[in-house]
Amino acid sequence: MKHTLTKTLLMLLASLLLFCCIGCSGGHSYESDAAYSHLFTETDDDAAKALKNVIIAQLDAYNQGDAEGYYALFNMEREDLNFNVAQFTSMRQNANLSCTPESIDTAFINEDNAQALITMTCRAEDKATGEVLYYYRTTTTYTMVRDGKWKVTLQTPGAEEDLMYTLTATETTTE
């Protein structure tokens, strides 16, 4: 009986430890994902990789239409969160939205603070007509704090490079 109890306690402890390790790792790792592996470099330490995974997960939520998942990274009051989620959901009813990261550079990162520059292309297409509503490239700066989880406290958009002309030129040459 004593041996069985000890064995059960050891199994429970091992399961709890495994759960904590998986739960604390921050979830899915995009480092080996073909769509995102180019965002990681050989010089990235574990902290940079973890931060990049958080940002990619947020953009992935945006692309999947998961408003709650996308806005979960932003440090905002509940009423602001509810407003933004409603706006996002409304936009997604009429348009396909996507933001594709081209690069993520960690400007600095320490135990509780980080700043990352995300260069990405963003695009919206009307669901009914397929018309491209916008298509641009920008570099956005995330200033982040960690209080258990990483949160964006300030999002500073950079200048937008309009890419609509590339669509027009491409469509003109293919028709």
Model-derived segments and spans:
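Exposed beta-sheet edge and beta->alpha loop/turn motif
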Residues: E111-E175
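Polar/charged side chains located within well-ordered beta-strands of beta-rich proteins
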Residues: Q58, N84-F88, R92, Q155-E160
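K/E-rich alpha-helical interaction surfaces of small helical-bundle regulatory domains
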Residues: G65-A67, G158-A159
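Short solvent-exposed beta->alpha transition segments
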Residues: N53, A67-L117, A124
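Bacterial N-terminal signal peptides that target proteins for export
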Residues: M1-L12
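C-terminal motif of bacterial Sec signal peptides marking the signal peptidase cleavage site
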Residues: F19-G23
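Intrinsically disordered, low-complexity repeat and linker tracts
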Residues: L17, G27-E42, M164-E175
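Short, low-complexity N-terminal intrinsically disordered segments enriched in polar/charged residues
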Residues: C24-Q64, A72-L73
